[in-house]
Amino acid sequence: MARTIINNKQVFQSYVLTTAKYDFSPYEKRIMYRLIELAQKEIEGIKLKDNLRKIAPTNFGREITMPVSDILKDEQDKHYTIAKAAFRSLSEKHIEYEDDEVWSYTPIITAPEIKKNSGSVKFYVFDNIWRCLLDFTKGFKKYELITAMKFKSAYAMRFYELMSGQTKPLFVLLEGPDGLRERFYLQGSMKK
């Protein structure tokens, strides 16, 4: 069963992550939402008191422990089929970064391990991914965590992130290198 959240807290997501080009499943998005939530708690200095969630520094980043139920949306996942697929898929995805001096290609998460008796998952996040979650140099989007977690579609989640708190009309091209089709990996899937 999914984790119950009493307060619909606001989270801040890096605009770099909001506008990035990627194709995630809703469960992969929920893993990312939980990472953003944990990263913000760490920088705010909030201690995790429930003994179910942990952020432990390592030589290369963070070791994250959390309940598998944190990524579910009112479903039962008795044999961890949904969770295994989501963590496996996200561990196969990378963030590619390049500027004038550096090129890097880093997995988003590594070594996911589900402990079936306790219902928890442990995985690792490299420092440059952790920093990306907290990179507000290009701005940020603020949205309600519970609302974002409730959507069934990854596209609905992405639109919610883009539109949340928007007071002026948002003009985003449909076509082109920064268009919605390319950002959402929908090239060739819809008729013009």
Predicted regions and their residues:
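Charged, alpha-helix-forming regions
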Residues: 1-192
